[in-house]
Amino acid sequence: MDRAALRAAAMGEKKEGGGGGAAADGGAGAAVSRALQQCGQLQKLIDISIGSLRGLRTKCSVSNDLTQQEIRTLEAKLVKYICKQQQSKLSVTPSDRTAELNSYPRFSDWLYIFNVRPEVVQEIPQELTLDALLEMDEAKAKEMLRRWGASTEECSRLQQALTCLRKVTGLGGEHKMDSGWSSTDARDSSLGPPMDMLSSLGRAGASTQGPRSISVSALPASDSPVPGLSEGLSDSCIPLHTSGRLTPRALHSFITPPTTPQLRRHAKLKPPRTPPPPSRKVFQLLPSFPTLTRSKSHESQLGNRIDDVTPMKFELPHGSPQLVRRDIGLSVTHRFSTKSWLSQVCNVCQKSMIFGVKCKHCRLKCHNKCTKEAPACRITFLPLARLRRTESVPSDINNPVDRAAEPHFGTLPKALTKKEHPPAMNLDSSSNPSSTTSSTPSSPAPFLTSSNPSSATTPPNPSPGQRDSRFSFPDISACSQAAPLSSTADSTRLDDQPKTDVLGVHEAEAEEPEAGKSEAEDDEEDEVDDLPSSRRPWRGPISRKASQTSVYLQEWDIPFEQVELGEPIGQGRWGRVHRGRWHGEVAIRLLEMDGHNQDHLKLFKKEVMNYRQTRHENVVLFMGACMNPPHLAIITSFCKGRTLHSFVRDPKTSLDINKTRQIAQEIIKGMGYLHAKGIVHKDLKSKNVFYDNGKVVITDFGLFGISGVVREERRENQLKLSHDWLCYLAPEIVREMIPGRDEDQLPFSKAADVYAFGTVWYELQARDWPFKHQPAEALIWQIGSGEGVRRVLASVSLGKEVGEILSACWAFDLQERPSFSLLMDMLERLPKLNRRLSHPGHFWKSADINSSKVMPRFERFGLGTLESGNPKM
């Protein structure tokens, strides 16, 4: 397409290089004319390339490997052209430059290359030039970009590009050794060219002595005849064996001498192989090697060639592990799987979603329709190892899991011997003594053999294709740009596995930090798809065992045939509750949902995982679950006693300040434990709290999340609301309720649980709900606006300390509501009722309670009179 323009640019460059002295004699006019001619020719190439790039970004699917390769090729060319324009302009003194020459390079072209949004470009003043932005300091430039509406990612991307351009152009077009810049925050290909592509520009044309930084970007090997535009970029690229995947085999080529000597590079024997020079950043402890001369023959074949070079044998310093680069990214195809969430935002369109897809490689979450617009997938090397304590689970007495030993693949380079293994860190004292030993964070081999793979509390042995859930690795913010995958290169690499230990990165899944989600939850969500009985023990040439999460699920699975179902004892929005027997008396919660719907089944298994990790005296004991469709059920211990709802409304029961305090403290202990585990109850109310002989047990936590998929017969234009449910809902939830929206889409949070506890606290004092005999429409307005709560607080007389707790829990702003730990401290400040049973007033008070059915009076404590029929409430 632009071959003729490239030849013209090459001829102009040769004239510039050959007639330097004549140009100097000709004066400034000749230099200006030559610079204008060069910039004009380059601008034509830029316009042609930008037109092609615009078509690729708008008309083609960016998730396609071929499209990604073409986009990177054009972006690489455009960056080279713009930097060449800047260097041509800088070759002329500022006083001799004309207005036409100063207009190069165009700022709009630079912004388009890095994929700045059009609305941001429109806000940028027309008079602003690239030179003016280069002269600004980092803070000022970032502030201006933000003022024009640029996002944080766009600001960071442009700042890195400008920093590199400053280093190149600040030398007046003369390239020096220290002008190179290696990116530490690489970006996605859809957001602009890789930053490492720019780093090679600062090293173009430099002397060939000493080691250089290595760019890991997959720059295309072009057959361009312009030596000045291609040499500087090509000689610093890492051969990624066509696929762009950086493997240990590719790492060996960093330190491998050329198979073809420099004197024979023009001989017609066979295409030469051109390994790059060693990198200071990848191997900081390696001895310096002389820089290898770049071969110019067969340049067009280097990008599509797999070089089988023989690694050079050398000795590393004793005990020095290889340092893996943190900015290495691998370009792969998305591996989407269907997912369901309680509340999630699409990473592409930024809209809320319940059902969608998630990439198992880069953990991208989006709608199914947004996959065409999703950015390219990346797998990152995980640089640091962090230990995580293994949760203890009971042995599976119903479904024993066969955990056979599994072969392990080495991940250490051959140069590292057994004596040079890094020292292992000690595990937590609470961990299983047979747990897998971890290596130091800088070690490239964090996977070692477990001493007891058959233990019930020990997760499966890790392999290169599987993550051990006890190890968590902090991710970097983004992944480096790399060349697209090639199926041929993948198969070739796997065929060569006996020769070179290759890490199967296509099976490894990199983790990304997600706001508000622990790594354990992320693992559960990613591996909750299938039970281990339906998973294959071998997947591809590299083995991969069932995940630890799926093993946990099978250990808690109870065959429905073993459960004896009794009479129904309750009905919830998600199904019926039956009394039953399974090694004793249990409560069986049958879920009325389509078990053959994979999305619903995954959501159910996720709730099982939430139940599995709970162990507290004030939380119902989880015993297992029936997970074989169509029989889906959660089995818990049977709660004796009465619900708190019926207990406080029974006029025969006596509730003094000590008893209400004790009940509230028990509820706070259980809720505080759930919140510490990262579990939001979502349906805390007096009907879900059982009270028996002074003991409080909280039930049905988390089940509210699946109520939206259970009650599918609802009408789209109607809201079915119960009075007892509205009284426990926080204002921010009531304001989000619209017809057709499922309950699991509402913004439930820990603060919403605190609000619900406020209503329970009110019931303990007043023995009724705060709003009575009002239609649902009136309750929605009173709760959503906060007016009804203010009226209740102003009209009721419950005492200072009780009112403070109530007003704190019912705060309109969720940020002002206290945590359950603070609520416990507030309860401790309540006055205590210390009166002996032999006090004369005790018998009179008891008779008064039984006769008039009113609560005792505590005027001496300032608590006022509480009656069950108070008309003010």
UniProtKB/Swiss-Prot annotation:
Changing residue 403 to A: No effect on interaction with MARK3. Keywords: ATP-binding, Cell membrane, Cell projection, Cytoplasm, Endoplasmic reticulum, Kinase, Membrane, Metal-binding, Nucleotide-binding, Phosphoprotein, Serine/threonine-protein kinase, Transferase, Zinc, Zinc-finger. InterPro entries: C1-like_sf (IPR046349), Kinase-like_dom_sf (IPR011009), PE/DAG-bd (IPR002219), Prot_kinase_dom (IPR000719), SAM/pointed_sf (IPR013761), SAM_KSR1_N (IPR046861), SAM_KSR1_N_sf (IPR046933), Ser-Thr/Tyr_kinase_cat_dom (IPR001245). It is a peripheral membrane protein. Changing residue 389 to A: Reduces phosphorylation of S-392 by MARK3. It is found in: Cytoplasm; Membrane; Cell membrane; Cell projection, Ruffle membrane. Residues 506-519 have a biased composition (Basic and acidic residues). Its EC number is 2.7.11.1. The modification Phosphoserine is found at residues 297, 320, 337, 392, 518, 838. Residues 520-530 have a biased composition (Acidic residues). Pfam families: PK_Tyr_Ser-Thr (PF07714), SAM_KSR1_N (PF20406). Coiled coil: none annotated. This is Kinase suppressor of Ras 1. It comes from Mus musculus.
